[in-house]
Amino acid sequence: QWIGRDRFVLSIGHSSLTLYNQLFFAGYGLELKDLESLRTWGSLTPGHPEYKHTKGVEMTTGPLGQGLSSAVGMAMASRRERGLFDPESPKGESPFDHFVYVVGGEGCLEEGVTSEASSLAGTQHLGNLIFIWDDNRISIEDDTVIAFSEDVLGRYAAYGWHTQHVDWTNGGTEYKEDVDGLYNAIREAQKVTDKPSIIRLSTIIAWPCPTKQGTGASHGSALGAEEVAGLKKALGFDPEVNFPAAPEVVEYTRANAKKNAESSRGAW
């Protein structure tokens, strides 16, 4: 808990396990038993992230759109704090400078509250706000085209946002999770200090599941034992082993996270 840290908001709170996995591998208060207790009463891993319940969670999310909208407030508060206590420092050189990162989906963008908050963010020139939109085109009712067909990047450009598109589907021809491409887009967004940024990240939901990837069947219900076994095979895991986490891997990731955190904290 230090004021110069970046903030991360998982606006798609139902994807909480992706956050819990990162906290586990970083050694940030979660152990394997906590992952095994996902969505059970009293566990540290509830169905949606809860602030002050699980270490490393910046805010409670769940109602779609709440995370992105609140992140706009976080970005405004950060700028206000800097203006009060360190207004003279060049951009990027104040101990109060940090970014607010948000991951959200179509469900967040369909909500009116995000339209209002995003318009405000553009008007306020919140260059410390970076929103990654997981564009998988799937809702619980299958293809989002039945209810959501607008030009999102065009709308956000009209709000005054900086826009980028990273297409992991390569136009629907081949799926490749180009992490470097996403990283480079984030770095470009960091350079734009007079506008908030949105990165459209085109993905395939539930990839590489054998039969349910890219379908509504993978959105709001369990995959099932057969599908999970196929997924494990596709990823090179033993389909008979649950929660594989080699001790040497966990030791490495936690040491690496600690080293990077100490370096960032020291620079701050």
PLM features per residue range, with description:
Residues 1, 12, 88-93, 98, ...:
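Conserved acidic/glycine
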